[in-house]
Amino acid sequence: MSVDTSVRLPGMPVKNPVMTASGTFGYGLEFAPYGDLRSLGGIVVKGLSLAPRLGNPMPRIAETPCGMLNAIGLQNCGVEKFLRDKLPRLPWRETPIIANLYACDADEFAELAGVLSAEEGVAALEVNISCPNVKAGGIAFGQDPCMAGKLAEAVKKRAGDKPVWVKLSPNVTDIVSIARAAVLGGADALTCINTLTGMSVDIRSRKPRLANVIGGLSGPAIKPVALRAVWQVCQAVSAPVIGVGGISSAEDVLEFILVGAHAVQIGTANFMRPDMAFRIAERLPQLMAELGIEDLASYRGSLRVG
């Protein structure tokens, strides 16, 4: 049986829905020894800021049951070095490269979008709205609908013809209100979800396992939360949703598409097996054929409720 794994996202058709999640796949080059980067639907590089960042002190990762905590602190080489040294070595003509943006205020986000707007090798911009807004007392952009909407608008104005994705935080009371505000502000697509806030402690040393004390929980433990969030957001907005959270198999991919996602991102599973994203992309068409799914468009959002 012949199947069609292609997906159309705003401004870019992709060969399959399997992408990588920011912060779990480096800049893409680090994983080239484990598979063909051209086989992926998209590569979302680790968060980029205007200036290089050293990140948080060690330890920055702690294993948890069914997942992991991280407090990397968005360590990165800075956008200029990425564009000069890393982007030219990526297969951007065959696989869309999505730049994930990190900044401390809306003006900085907009400036970063402007730097990337003319780069031919960058297919889209993903905005990390879990960042604290220093001009608003440190509250995260993603925790306030008004701030989320204004940030999406500010980035969209400077993004040129680049599609803008807004990555939603699950650490909110009502993720749907944030999603709606982001779309009204100009977001072309939504990435759903970022990590959940968590912590881990050592009862013998009486110390936290992370130097930052609190970190972001990811991995299989958060998949039910991510599925619920994607389902709710897809019911509320017309913009495409990219699902992320605990995905480690082709079956997981289809679960997210079943509840409405257009595409998915593989995150923590890349630490379990560095070839995981490649394996899932290879397995997906086989699974679709086994289940009699001819194309993803007809399967998307077909969950039978009631």
Curated annotation (Swiss-Prot):
Its cofactor is FMN. InterPro entries: Aldolase_TIM (IPR013785), DHO_dehydrogenase (IPR050074), DHOD_1B (IPR033888), Dihydroorotate_DH_1 (IPR024920), Dihydroorotate_DH_1_2 (IPR012135), Dihydroorotate_DH_cat (IPR005720), Dihydroorotate_DH_CS (IPR001295), Dihydroorotate_DH_I (IPR049622). Pathway: Pyrimidine metabolism; UMP biosynthesis via de novo pathway; orotate from (S)-dihydroorotate (NAD(+) route): step 1/1. FMN binds at S22, K46, G47, N100, N128, K167, I193, G219, G245, G246, G267, T268. Its EC number is 1.3.1.14. One of its GO terms (molecular function) is dihydroorotate dehydrogenase (NAD+) activity. It comes from the Bacteria. Its main location: cytoplasm. GO terms for cellular component: cytoplasm. It is an enzyme of class 1 (oxidoreductase). Heterotetramer of 2 PyrK and 2 PyrD type B subunits. Belongs to the dihydroorotate dehydrogenase family. Type 1 subfamily. This is Dihydroorotate dehydrogenase B (NAD(+)), catalytic subunit. It comes from Solidesulfovibrio magneticus (strain ATCC 700980 / DSM 13731 / RS-1) (Desulfovibrio magneticus). The gene is pyrD.
